[in-house]
Curated annotation (Swiss-Prot):
PROSITE patterns given in the database record: COPROGEN_OXIDASE
Keyword Thylakoid: no
Catalysed reaction, written as an equation: coproporphyrinogen III + O2 + 2 H(+) = protoporphyrinogen IX + 2 CO2 + 2 H2O
A GO term for molecular function: coproporphyrinogen oxidase activity
Protein role: Involved in the heme biosynthesis. Catalyzes the aerobic oxidative decarboxylation of propionate groups of rings A and B of coproporphyrinogen-III to yield the vinyl groups in protoporphyrinogen-IX.
Protein's name in the database: Oxygen-dependent coproporphyrinogen-III oxidase
Binding site for a divalent metal cation: H102, H112, H151, H181
Cofactor dependence: a divalent metal cation
Cysteines paired by S-S bonds: none
Lineage: Bacteria, Pseudomonadati, Pseudomonadota, Gammaproteobacteria, Vibrionales
Organism: Vibrio campbellii (strain ATCC BAA-1116)
Active site: H112 (proton donor)
């Protein structure tokens, strides 16, 4: 088995944060990320620190956050040990890059990506470790061309790791980003995986690199194609309404959000994924035959691209 190299993972994640921020700033052309570096105080339940970077009021991006964090603790939170009882009583480290981008233009999809590494150690025993992550796309006015190119990029980056990887991680994404109380997916999916340790460490690490670097390759061409489409109040209102689904998912179902809040994580960083504005409307129904109705009819159930 290849050696576990926590330092190399951390260095990659920090450089990935830098690279993604630079590419998004370049695409936006106006806004820049403002960094909020943070460190946990000694004696807190969770140690460590991170770099939260937030961009606001750009030409294209209304708000976006790209967060790096590296935290450690002596005891796992309940959300983690519930499905992994062997982690109880182990000290742990968790590090990752997580980002959500909320564009202004309703024709530009919202996007999310995350890559992370987790290790739990106990003296005299082998460490328990895994990688997780993925990326997913949430359009409000979808184009088949965009969904296809998003998934093509995902397929291509998965291919060197095995023919089964894309279909498995694509299906996992469809299942994970699903709102049971709405009976709809959050968007058109992408990749999602967790507990990745079935390969040697180096291969798992290489896959994480491919996913992290593949995010901008998948997303920025879509932004470029849609950023100049004209829109009015109707499209903006629908965008804000659909952003409400993002809020519902993150606060009710997202394991990362629950893990962060239960383990005493940094609330501002955990909730940076929230849209700056969202709205709810009682018993909303899209008009038959409208572009809004098409989202519901064609894009909010899992499909092959």
């Amino acid at each position: 088995m290849s050696a576990i190299d926590k330092h190399a993972v951390k260095q990659f994640l920090m450089s990935l944060q830098d690279s993604i921020c630079q590419q998004l700033e370049q695409e936006d052309g106006k806004a820049v990320f403002v960094e909020d570096a943070w460190q946990r105080e000694k004696g807190e339940r969770l140690g460590g620190g991170g770099r939260t970077r937030v961009l606001r009021d750009g030409h294209i991006f209304e708000q976006g956050g790209v967060n790096f964090s590296h935290v450690e603790g002596n005891e796992m939170p309940a959300s983690a040990t519930a499905h992994r009882p062997e982690l109880a009583g182990r000290r742990f480290e968790a590090m990752g890059v997580s980002l959500v981008i909320h564009p202004k233009n309703p024709y530009v999809p919202t996007s999310h990506a995350n890559v992370r590494f987790f290790i739990a150690e106990k003296d005299g025993e082998d460490p328990i470790w895994w990688f997780g992550g993925g990326f997913d796309l949430t359009p409000f006015y979808p184009f088949d061309e965009d969904c296809q190119s998003w998934h093509d990029t995902a397929k291509q980056l998965c291919a060197p790791f095995g023919d089964e990887v894309y279909p498995e991680h694509k299906a996992w994404c469809d299942k994970y980003f699903f709102l049971p109380h709405r009976n709809e997916t959050r968007g058109v999916g992408g990749l999602f995986f967790d507990d990745l340790n079935q390969w040697e460490f180096d291969k798992c690490f290489d896959y994480i690199k491919a996913v992290g670097e593949g995010y901008c390759q998948a997303y920025l061409p879509i932004v470029s194609r849609r950023k100049d489409i004209e829109f009015g109040e109707r499209e903006r209102e629908f965008q804000l309404y659909r952003r409400g689904r993002y809020v519902e998912f993150n606060l009710v179902y997202d394991r990362g959000t629950l893990f962060g809040l239960q383990s005493g994580g940094r609330t501002e960083s955990i909730l940076m994924s929230m849209p700056p504005l969202a709205r709810w409307e009682y018993s909303y129904e899209p008009q038959t035959g409208s572009p809004e109705a098409e989202l519901y009819e064609r894009y909010l159930t899992p499909r092959e691209w």
